[in-house]
Amino acid sequence: WETLPETAAAICDHDIPKLEALLQGGLDLDVPIQLSEYIKLMPLEIAVFRNDVPMIHFLLEHGADPGLAEEQPLLLTAARCCGPEVVALFAEQTAILSPKQKERAIQEVRWGKRPENIQVLEQAGITVEKFGGEAFRAAVSEGNAKLARLLLEKGADINYHKPDMVFPNAPTAVTEAARHKNLPMVRWLIEQGADITIADKYGDRPYTVAVQNKNQELADYLKALEPEEWHNEQEKIRQLMPYKLPAKLVEYLKTGPLRLEFPDQEWVKWAELYSFCLLYTSDAA
């Protein structure tokens, strides 16, 4: 902002004498400050976003209500922006958080690169075992091995696969590692017990993702770990019989070409089909 309201400027400048004068003049710390047309924050909220520990204590000591915030509960903001000392100040807010907000608390730790806050959250009842699956999958997807290892050690579900806005297809962490061609991560997850047979809602599993990415080394590694019958043509024919696929379609999926071109279309120029042996059935779930 080019200019800040007087109270916000005093907080950002850590101008204690100015704030004391404003308080003597009747400043109410529980009234939000309009920072722009669409943004307003509580005074304490500004201090938490700035991780200004002395200012946070000053405002609390002068009556700021820790339960008031415009963006989200201050425990979540502190988990992202501050250290354990500040997170502990708002730990009692755990009691009013929804399960989704508790999941977000672990995500805030990931976004803010504040793994040191996990212990405080756990002590407050926001355990990684119960609420850390979403953050674990995201950490794996972005290749953050250190955080993924920490969350797994704390009890995160290695096979967590609920859908969310980032992962609407409900993949597992190991499927995401395969999608990003992260062979070391895939190996590590499997060593830790990841289930490579769990498919997302479109039928993709780590092996099929590796094949789609033309990552032969990863595909070969995963294929060797899957049930042999999943890669047997006769077994696939048996599995697909209830679907009554036309014989010509089955033959086409065996021989290709699997890439269909639509050069005259404006929006969709091509589509790529699954090969016959990659077709997903409920038997392979």
Regions found by a protein language model. Give the residues of each.
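Ankyrin-repeat-protein effector appendages
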Residues: Q123-F131, K201-D204, T208-F276
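Conserved small/polar residues in nucleotide/adenosyl-binding loops
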Residues: Y280-A284
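A generic tandem-repeat structural signature
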Residues: I56-W111
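Conserved ankyrin/ankyrin-like repeat signature
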Residues: K18, P54-M55, E85-V86, E116-N117, ...
